[in-house]
C-alpha cells in the first residue's frame, strides 16, 4: 500500500500537474461555475491512468437501499476490474456548510466502499481552497473514518476494512486579477 501512497504523493508533488494541467499552475483559472471541480476530477482521473489503473469519472457504486453514490473518480484494476481507489474532489471554503459537505463526502466514500464489498484499498477526500480559509479538521474526519458514520438514511457505515484514507488539500492563491493558481498541497495519510 505504501508504494501506492508514495507514487500518488510523488506524482502530485512532482511535475505531473504542471505537465498535464498547466492551467492550474501557469495560466491560472477563474473561480467561476464548476470548472475547477472538472479540472480537479480530471487531475485525479488522469493520475489514475498514469499509475496504470482504469480510471472512471463519476463511477457509480453498486445500488443498495440508500441513495445513488457516484465517486468523482474510481480507479479499477485493469486485470480483474476491482475498484481499488475511490476519490471525491470538493471545494472547501471554511464555513460550517463547507465542513458539513466534507463529512457528507467522506460518508459517501465509506458507503461506496461498503457497497463495493470493501474491495477499495484507498479512499481519497481531496479538497481545494481559494485564498485564506480555516483548515479542514482532518483529525475529526480521520476519527469519523476510524469509528464509522451514519448515512443520510440513518444506516451505520463502519470503517472500511483493509482500506486507508488520504485527506488531500490543494491551496490556490488568487492573484490581483482574481485568477487562481495552485501554490501548495498538503497530504495526510491514515
Residue spans for each PLM region:
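Short, well-structured alpha-helical interface segments that form or flank functional binding sites
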Residues: 35, 39-43, 66-68, 97-108
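Acidic/glycine-enriched edge-of-secondary-structure segments
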Residues: 54-68, 81-101
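Domain-level recognition of nuclease-like catalytic cores that cleave nucleotide substrates
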Residues: 124-190
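Acidic-basic catalytic patches of nuclease active cores, encompassing PD-(D/E)XK
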Residues: 1-62
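Active-site beta-strand-loop-beta-strand hairpin of nuclease catalytic cores
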Residues: 74-86, 116
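Short glycine-rich loop/turn motifs
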Residues: 70-72
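Catalytic cores of nucleic-acid endonucleases
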Residues: 92-149
